[in-house]
Amino acid sequence: MLSAQLDEYLAEMNLSATTEQKKQLVGFVEMLNKWNKAYNLTSIRDPQQMLIRHIMDSLAVSKHLVGERFIDVGTGPGLPGIPLAIMNPERSFVLLDSLGKRIRFQKQVQHELGIHNISSVESRVEAFEPEVKFDGVLSRAFASIEDMLHWCHHLPSETGCYYALKGQLADNEMANIPQGFEVTDIIELQVPRLDEQRHLLRVIKK
């Protein structure tokens, strides 16, 4: 059932995936559903809704990524980082979260599904100092762009940028962009079977 739905949604989004990638995406949903019963990793309980609201919602960003090295800040159970890593095996993703149970889940996913381009780190964002800066800083965890730029200012490389995954944009969201930053793109994302607004904001340091 999930496999058939995934095929349908990928076709709607014009995304191509190998048999192995599809197997990993479905496997991730199945593991998330299983672990969620004990670890409370997401408020969404229905695997079919997980596929839409977690997997496809994450993959809507995929074609907009530029660069090789990414960090997903406040990744939770690995969103959007794990679906993006599955679909972009040539890129590397650091998954950052401060809760140990989430990191344990991510590492089990990595082991069971054979995902080799992710690295899970248990840390608060302000305490994490990367040896090499990132081409892209991703997050769907922050309430505002302002918060994201404040807490993640030390993560991108000189040419790197921020990718903020948002729902409906607040009227004052753009007005509160701190000095020294510029919003280069506001992209309206289309997620199959999701009748809610989704946006991707790309921000750079001036």
Curated annotation (Swiss-Prot):
This is Ribosomal RNA small subunit methyltransferase G. Belongs to the methyltransferase superfamily. RNA methyltransferase RsmG family. It is an enzyme of class 2 (transferase). Its EC number is 2.1.1.170. Its main location: cytoplasm. It catalyses: guanosine(527) in 16S rRNA + S-adenosyl-L-methionine = N(7)-methylguanosine(527) in 16S rRNA + S-adenosyl-L-homocysteine. The keyword Nucleotidyltransferase does not apply. Signal peptide: none annotated. Gene3D superfamilies: Vaccinia Virus protein VP39. The keyword S-adenosyl-L-methionine applies. S-adenosyl-L-methionine binds at residues 74, 79, 125-126, 140. GO terms for cellular component: cytosol.
